Amino acid sequence: MDLYNLRNNMRSRYFSMLEYLNNGFEIFKMFVKKHPLLVFSHFVFSTVMVLFITFPFTEQAVKMYEFAQKVSNTKMQKNININEYASLLSSLFSMLLLYALISLILQFVAVIIRKKAGLEIEMEEDAEKEKIKKDKFKLGKITLKFIIMMAVYLIIGLALIMLIVVFSLVLDSSSALFIVSVIYFTLFFNVLYLQQIYYLRDVNLVEAFRYNLYLSKGKRLRILLPIIMIALITFFINYALNYFTGITIGKLQNLQILGIVTSATGGIVKTFSVLYTIIAENLVYFNVEYMDLKGLK
């Protein structure tokens, strides 16, 4: 793919959604060839996550549900073992922590992919520019940014949970969830360019948020439509793969093999979806920023 012409085109006009998707897919193929280990690591952790949800996590959740049913049954309350409850609760909590850890690793790999993909798009292919790429890709700095971002996400998540609790005290639960959902989506629609700016530019989180609000004016649909389209493509691919896998391996009547194969296909689809979405988001961001800078000249 000719990235030089791509950059020139992004500086001269706004792309259509189809152009974002087509160019994004070409860069996706190029990125997979240049960074196979990075892509493979995302696939491995994605597969592990699906496997984790399919087997141990689901098993513990079912046991916890069965115990809750036992507690609700008045005839069986005398036979309740407190140690059994503590053991189940401890196991479930450990599973949640492990799930959170795998999720964090996946998000960190996605951040590295975003940074490397952004550098691939923006930088020229010669020895001097390759040196600039290495200088701009500083793992320590990216890690620090990631930790700050995750801390902010955690604070926002806890704040939303607290709001649900507070609103539930004065309103019914459905109304409380509706209000918090409105707050969540309001936040979501106002951070559409945040990650691209934060990880691709040398700015802090506050500066990135302000610039994100500036670029978002009239440009929210420009980034939302490609994301929605990729999500739909991913859904149909995932559905087709699961259907084919279910028919093929279901004949063996072996749930373990079915779970493993489904997890592997799920890992492939998730990696494709994340990588394709990240590249499309980067393209939209660069295009919007270049055109904004062009308008200021």
Question: PLM ranges: what are they?
Answer:
Residues 2-14, 60-86, 106-107, 111-125, ...:
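Juxtamembrane transition segments at transmembrane-helix termini in multipass membrane proteins
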Residues 46, 50, 54, 208, ...:
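A generic signature of intrinsically disordered, low-complexity regions enriched in glycine/proline
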